[in-house]
């Protein structure tokens, strides 16, 4: 199948290109970058300087998208896809979108977090929100929106508790993230980040309503705090909650086991000494999850790679499932970066 990558010079776009180089079913024939248009892809992306693939693929302007693509992955910066979406859908029938645009349909939420999306009114656009482990495809949709990286980690942590109604409604989400989560355009310098750890967003973040939306009406108030770590990639999410009276630790453990036992890319850790770690999941499409209960309180933690499971990896996973391929096609050789 011929596929395209929109926004291929960013971190997520580059990871998509890397994953698809060896994918047996998806062949990248178009990749866009306004900054590098006309230049060889593997000379502009630093991670490919010595791999010797020599595909002779060059970056193109988004306006040059051809008509012969089966589908595209969009890793365009937030706010860009809405400006081009109608033209894109005239040339291809399906977009797997890893940016924030089109995740919501509620006008109030869009106005606050994604005003560019709100400005688009078209009967041509049919979008859906898709979590590979929990969602079914809407085959009428032409934009399949993948979760944001921090939202996804938080959803994995909280979902078994909320789905099985084991906790009181209100939860608090605490997320630590590496610098690549901000993309290449971050204004923060290395001197600001090196050796530092800080709160960068409390209670107001565009992933917050996404978490609430995915967890549904059973969840109450969702508190949120995001912290910057002095690492390049990785997300560590902790969800704090109070379990309901009569709920035991065994009930909680069973809920996590039942939820994730058949999930290819979510590892539910059960051993007493086993805990989610960034070094176990960075470089892979896996998420690790574990819940601990003590005196009526529950802490559920998740680790994942924000650029893979939180973006490019889950997009490839979703495309595999959409086209009824083996779920881990093109993802099965990724190993963690240890130590």
Curated annotation (Swiss-Prot):
The active site is at residue 149. Pathway: Amino-acid biosynthesis; L-arginine biosynthesis; N(2)-acetyl-L-ornithine from L-glutamate: step 3/4. Its EC number is 1.2.1.38. Its main location: cytoplasm. GO terms for cellular component: cytoplasm. Transmembrane segments: none annotated. Belongs to the NAGSA dehydrogenase family. Type 1 subfamily. This is N-acetyl-gamma-glutamyl-phosphate reductase 1.
